[in-house]
């Protein structure tokens, strides 16, 4: 049987110091973790041309990983015909506008029905690209723009841009509280020691920087623009809670509603607009195109739920 080859260079950002099996699950998300671990044990995984069969091998970053396999029966993430809202597409990249509720890639609680499954259906060769071309992710209930690489060349270029903080990503959100001025939150973020699905600010965490400025103020809320300098999991949500202005509707980091009038206003919004997600939208992305080397940018207007809430708050 002809061997199938998969290869990728390990990025430094977010990968250095992690176990081999963890690295593979991030680079080759189209395959299940059990499948990847089996390939390691079966001597099908090479690091810089040498066999590595220890799943707990620590990876430094920068290594070339190659997988050879003839076992086509191992479980993989299946292609699924899921519609994607395409903003821009050429032979190198894809820009999509993700709706709230759509998961980026399979994981605990969401085994399918994800953007990754949609990409596998839409592009038959994308499984050979690490992470199926997914450069960055958005939380399940955060809407907005994402960039997908359609070639290994584009993937490596875009990952490098992301590492060097050359991809500009902006968001809009509605926060609870009347913010006085914009500013910068520069505080490390790490996994919460007890609530494993949550992140938290901690001096032992990874460097995390969020820029924010006010778009409009209301009686009990503020419409805010954010720019990410780093891209940690739940970064904007955690940083806003840290400074006392949690995102409206956030089920994990929403904070406590204080004051009778304040509580009543939030309850009215939740009921009237059926808001069960954080009011956060990735509305702008800009980077140098990996092939043409031209600066390109895209914008996506707010989803209807956030538009309706802002109209309500203006009254």
UniProtKB/Swiss-Prot annotation:
The keyword Plastid belongs to this UniProt entry's keyword annotation? no
Q: Identify one Pfam family in the record.
A: S4
Q: Which SMART domains match?
A: S4
- Protein's UniProt keywords contain RNA-binding: yes
Q: What is its EC number?
A: 5.4.99.23
- Which locations, inside or outside the cell, does it occupy? Cytoplasm
Q: Name one GO biological process term.
A: enzyme-directed rRNA pseudouridine synthesis
UniProt-recorded name of the protein: Ribosomal large subunit pseudouridine synthase D
Lineage summary: Bacteria, Pseudomonadati, Pseudomonadota, Gammaproteobacteria, Enterobacterales
């Amino acid at each position: 049987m002809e061997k199938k080859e998969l290869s990728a260079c390990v990025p430094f950002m977010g990968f250095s110091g992690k176990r081999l099996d963890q690295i593979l699950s991030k680079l080759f998300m189209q395959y299940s973790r059990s499948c990847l671990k089996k390939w390691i044990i079966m001597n099908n995984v090479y690091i810089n041309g040498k066999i590595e069969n220890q799943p707990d091998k620590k990876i430094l970053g920068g290594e070339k990983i190659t997988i050879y396999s003839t076992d086509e029966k191992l479980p993989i993430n299946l292609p699924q015909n899921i519609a994607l809202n395409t903003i821009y597409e050429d032979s190198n990249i894809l820009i999509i506008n993700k709706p709230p509720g759509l998961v980026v890639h399979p994981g605990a609680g969401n085994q399918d029905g994800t953007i990754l499954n949609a990409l596998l259906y839409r592009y038959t060769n994308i499984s050979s690209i690490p992470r199926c071309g997914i450069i960055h992710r958005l939380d399940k209930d955060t809407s907005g723009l994402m960039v997908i690489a359609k070639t290994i060349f584009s993937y490596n270029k875009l990952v490098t841009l992301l590492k060097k903080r050359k991809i500009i990503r902006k968001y809009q959100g509605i926060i609870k509280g009347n913010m006085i001025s914009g500013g910068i939150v520069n505080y490390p973020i790490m996994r919460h020691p007890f609530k494993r699905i949550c992140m938290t600010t901690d001096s032992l965490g990874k460097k995390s920087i969020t820029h924010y400025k006010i778009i409009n103020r209301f009686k009990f809320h503020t419409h805010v623009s954010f720019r990410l300098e780093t891209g940690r999991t739940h970064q904007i949500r955690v940083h806003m809670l840290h400074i006392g202005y949690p995102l409206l509707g956030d089920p994990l980091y929403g904070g406590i509603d204080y004051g009778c009038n304040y509580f009543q206003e939030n309850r009215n919004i939740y009921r009237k607009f059926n808001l069960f997600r954080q009011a956060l939208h990735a509305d702008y992305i800009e980077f140098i195109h990996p092939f043409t080397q031209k600066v390109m940018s895209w914008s996506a207007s707010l989803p209807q739920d956030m538009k309706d809430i802002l109209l309500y708050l203006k009254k």
